[in-house]
Amino acid sequence: MLPRIISIVALYVITLLLMALQKPLFLMWYAERAADASASDLIGVVWHGLLLDSTTAGYIAVVPWLMMLISVWIKTSERVMERMLKIYFAVIAFIVALIVAVDMGLFRHWDFRLDSTIIPYLRTPKEAAASVTWGDLLPTLILFCGYGALLYVAWRPITKVYKAVKQSLAQRFTTTLAMILLGGFIFLAIRGGVDTAPANVSKVYFSDNMFLNQAATNPIFSFISSASRSELKDSDYRYYSDEECAEIFSAISEDKEMANTESVSWAMVLAMMTFLARP
């Protein structure tokens, strides 16, 4: 039981620290804009940003937690668990590092943290890349590789914590109960605490300086949150069938033609009256 709990707690704490590391990195990246901020403001960026960092760490810990919970009842060797965790950490490190690097590069041009606004540009990558220079690309590429490697190296020791120990039925129930309790804390972290409102970007805003509020925002949470809200289908806005739409537009067109005809007729009458009124 203990190795499972240790691995999840360690993953959460390490991820939280790595998410918090983005704040001073962002402030250094845009040092010219952070130069006027006081020391308390800079500390506030990290402190207030911990809320969304904690939520993001909770999201990342969910899958390993579920794997550990399932392994209580389905026999899983240490080698298999280690391999699954390595694959998961590699994929997540790639995705997180990519989001962080792209966000860091685009903020200079967009002046807000990465969100679903970027999705339409991904459909036309050639056009989007046409305006990118090596001055923009090289630093973000270095950041992507460096931060991604840091994430994976920090997470990798967790893959060796799990131990496939044979347990009695009572021990399995005890372990399951402990894992479910731990899952409750993860859920609270994802939700952003016990407040009425769940975690959202505005919860980390603490300053009249919008740059500092943006610096406190977690780009991974910002992107996932906005992307989930923007997943609306065309059918969500369709109140009429195609046939009904055609009839409505046809009626509008006919009314418009009649209005144009009447306008022309009245214009001719006014012109005639003006002509006759001339001495």
Residue ranges and their predicted role:
Residues 168-194:
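Internal/C-terminal transmembrane anchor helices
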Residues 1-14, 80-94, 171-176:
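Alpha-helical transmembrane segments and their helix-start/interface "positive-inside/aromatic belt" motifs
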Residues 55-68, 141-156:
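Hydrophobic cores of alpha-helical transmembrane segments in multi-pass inner/ER membrane proteins
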Residues 193-279:
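Soluble catalytic regions of membrane-associated enzymes that act on cell-envelope
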Residues 93-97, 144-154, 177-187:
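Hydrophobic core of alpha-helical transmembrane segments in multi-pass integral membrane proteins
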Residues 72-75, 146-177:
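Cytosolic-side transmembrane helix boundary signature
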Residues 63-91, 161-162, 251-256:
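Cytoplasmic juxtamembrane interface segments
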Residues 21-52, 85-144, 162-165, 191-221:
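Membrane-interfacial interhelical loops
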